[in-house]
């Protein structure tokens, strides 16, 4: 994680996502641009709320941990996506864990600055309301809904989300992947073998490579995590 002191890039993101119409100049002075590497955590469930993050480049993975210690994936997010908005409104600790799937760029502003300079700003409040409403509107695609799908669909969707680009390859820990999509190591291993036999993916030296992205899309029907 590092702060990017690039005023040109900062302005480009503000214009691209029409954030100049949301944040007034005094508030913009409290916004900073940050870069996170692939696999880096933006926040963890239970962390003390501190910032509102706005994803302006890259992809995020959002997952949660149950009381029993099991970790399940909830969804993947693309720009423009807010992290920490619900926590700001509810004044609660972070409710989910958020990880960078690719290199990501995020705008960041402290909750204190929001409270001090935008507590009653209708533009900011409308922006937050729209984002939170959309999250609740799409809640039908939550964990319980995902688990209704066969493991084949869940795995195909997961691979499409974490392996970006055609013929992309990555080293995936099958135990972690199985936990995230809510199945066993043995089951996910069998499904991966089936995908290999169908020529959809290749597994070699611990890495999985997508060979037939369209074939995986057919199995996924639609990507249930995005």
Label each residue range with its predicted role.
Residues 1-38, 77, 82-83, 87-89:
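Cyclic nucleotide-binding regulatory module and flanking cytosolic helices
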Residues 42-47:
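Short phosphate-coordinating micro-motif centered on Lys-Gly-acidic
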Residues 151, 160-226:
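Phosphate-/nucleic-acid-contacting segments
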Residues 39, 50-62, 79-80:
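Glycine- and acidic-residue-biased ligand/ion/polar-headgroup-sensing regions
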Residues 101, 119-185:
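Polybasic "coupling" helices that flank or enter modular domains
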Residues 59, 103-105, 207:
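Structural motif
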Residues 23, 73-130, 137:
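Cyclic-nucleotide recognition modules
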């Amino acid at each position: 994680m590092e702060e990017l002191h690039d005023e040109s890039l900062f302005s480009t993101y503000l214009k691209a996502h029409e954030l100049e119409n949301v944040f007034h100049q005094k508030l913009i002075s409290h916004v900073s641009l940050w870069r996170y590497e692939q696999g880096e955590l933006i926040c963890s469930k239970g962390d003390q709320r501190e910032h509102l993050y706005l994803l302006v480049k890259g992809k995020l993975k959002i997952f949660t941990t149950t009381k029993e210690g099991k970790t399940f994936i909830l969804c993947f997010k693309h720009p423009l996506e807010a992290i920490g908005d619900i926590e700001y409104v509810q004044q609660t600790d972070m409710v989910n864990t958020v990880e960078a799937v690719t290199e990501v760029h995020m705008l960041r502003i402290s909750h204190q600055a929001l409270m001090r300079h935008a507590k009653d700003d209708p533009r900011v409040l409308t922006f937050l309301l729209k984002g939170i409403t959309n999250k609740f509107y799409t809640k039908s695609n939550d964990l319980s809904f995902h688990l209704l799908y066969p493991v084949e669909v869940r795995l195909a969707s997961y691979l499409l989300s974490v392996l970006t680009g055609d013929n992309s390859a990555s080293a995936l820990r099958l135990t972690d992947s199985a936990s995230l999509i809510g199945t066993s190591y043995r089951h996910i291993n069998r499904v991966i073998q089936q995908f290999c036999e169908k020529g959809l993916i290749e597994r070699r030296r611990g890495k999985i490579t997508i060979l037939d992205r369209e074939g995986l899309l057919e199995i996924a029907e639609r990507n249930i995590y995005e």
